Amino acid sequence: MVINIFYICTGEYKRFFDKFYLSCEDKFIPEFGKKYYVFTDSDRIYFSKYLNVEVINVEKNCWPLNTLLRFSYFLKVIDKLQTNSYTFFFNANAVIVKEIPFSTFMESDLIGVIHPGYKNRISILYPWERRKNATCYLGYLKKGIYYQGCFNGGKTASFKRLIQICNMMTMADLKKNLIAKVHDESYLNYYYYYNKPLLLSELYSWPEKYGENKDAKIIMRDKERESWYGNIKK
């Protein structure tokens, strides 16, 4: 079985890829080979040294479309993946620092990571989309988990369904000139509210800026340390 990896790196985010790739090859589900689908506006030659990387060219958009449109990117390739495989998305700044075996996911259709910034907060304080005219609206009386958008996926058939629905909702809102509060993460949280995934702890998305955590399995590198990052959201 091949494990499919979705990775978006438009613009300067390509600088993160080498370190992510090497860590993923070494520590993420090492029992199986991996195929990487890299969505980028960079030249293909930048990734040509890796034989298991397929480059999918996408247009570089301004913030927040460069993250909001991720579901439409994924639809470009999802149909050609084997339905009995597994597919996972990682943020560009992810680095796997401890081995994560296949047994972590094998019994689950989908996985979701609790957002470390909202782990101990009550639901009314979550940045769920509260506007009633948004397709991803979740009211203040709802209770649940707030998921981080940096690492998700699962069985390819289940992940495909998530992608299709979240893309449909995203496009419906864009037609109304409505941008969800936390962009793609708002749609992910809506979907997971009604389709509960296997919940992974914050150790699977530990922010580097929170300081060292010897138990962390995946580190999210501090993008703000990069000199180019200040221009991303302009």
From Swiss-Prot:
Alphabetical UniProt keywords: Glycosyltransferase, Lipopolysaccharide biosynthesis, Transferase
Residues the record marks as active site: 185 (nucleophile)
Residue ranges crossing the lipid bilayer per the database entry: none
Cofactor note: Binds 1 Mn(2+) ion per subunit.
Catalysed reaction, written as an equation: alpha-L-Fuc-(1->2)-beta-D-Gal-(1->3)-alpha-D-GalNAc-(1->3)-alpha-D-GalNAc-di-trans,octa-cis-undecaprenyl diphosphate + UDP-alpha-D-galactose = alpha-L-Fuc-(1->2)-[alpha-D-Gal-(1->3)]-beta-D-Gal-(1->3)-alpha-D-GalNAc-(1->3)-alpha-D-GalNAc-di-trans,octa-cis-undecaprenyl diphosphate + UDP + H(+)
EC id: 2.4.1.309
List of residues binding substrate: 8-13, 93-95, 115-118
Any coiled-coil regions, as ranges: none
UniProt entry tagged with the keyword Disulfide bond: no
Domain of life according to the entry: Bacteria
Listed GO MF terms: hexosyltransferase activity
Database matches in Pfam families: Glyco_transf_6
Cofactor: Mn(2+)
Example GO biological process: O antigen biosynthetic process
Associated pathway: Bacterial outer membrane biogenesis; LPS O-antigen biosynthesis
GO cellular component terms, semicolon-separated: membrane
Uppermost EC category: transferase
NCBIfam families: Gltr_6
Miscellaneous information on this protein: O86:H2 and O86:B7 subtypes share the same O unit, but the O units are polymerized from different terminal sugars in different glycosidic linkages.
Recorded family membership: Belongs to the glycosyltransferase 6 family.
Functional note: Involved in the assembly of the O-repeating unit during O-antigen biosynthesis.
Official protein name in the record: O-antigen biosynthesis glycosyltransferase WbnI
Organism: Escherichia coli
